[in-house]
Design a protein with these regions (language model features):
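Negatively charged, low-complexity tracts enriched in Asp/Glu with abundant Ser/Thr
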Residues: 1-41, 63-80
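Short, surface-exposed beta-strand/strand-loop-strand elements in extracellular ectodomains
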Residues: 57-63
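Amphipathic alpha-helical binding modules
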Residues: 75-97
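Hydrophobic residues embedded in beta-strands of well-ordered beta-sheets
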Residues: 35, 55-56
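Short beta-strand micro-motifs enriched in acidic
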Residues: 49-53
Length: 97
């Protein structure tokens, strides 16, 4: 998946997170075809990293506690799978913070 598509999916699906000034920044990976998106707010800081072979890593830390609230690795083969995982897993956990 291209980084711009991933960035749009994240912004579209994270809009309901009660975060002030949600910022998403693209970071080019050192390994070919890898990249990450850093996602920062007042409530959490995090990243979604894409590795070759459709492998994603999701890592979010609470700003209030400094503890990991999400640290998951997942193979997602389509945009639909990514959207569902963001809504049903990542977004749900962030809203529970």
């Amino acid at each position: 998946m291209e980084a711009k598509n991933l960035e749009k999916i994240i912004k579209d699906n994270m809009e309901f997170v009660p975060a002030s000034n949600l910022k998403v920044n693209y970071v080019e990976g050192k390994i070919s075809d890898s990249y990450s998106l850093n996602i920062d707010s007042k409530e959490f800081i995090g990243s979604i990293t894409f590795w070759p072979s459709n492998n994603y890593e999701f890592h979010f830390i609470s700003c209030a506690t400094g503890k990991n609230v999400i640290l998951e690795e997942k193979i997602l083969l389509s945009e639909v799978e990514l959207k569902e995982f963001l809504k049903n897993t990542i977004l749900k956990k962030l809203l529970e913070m």
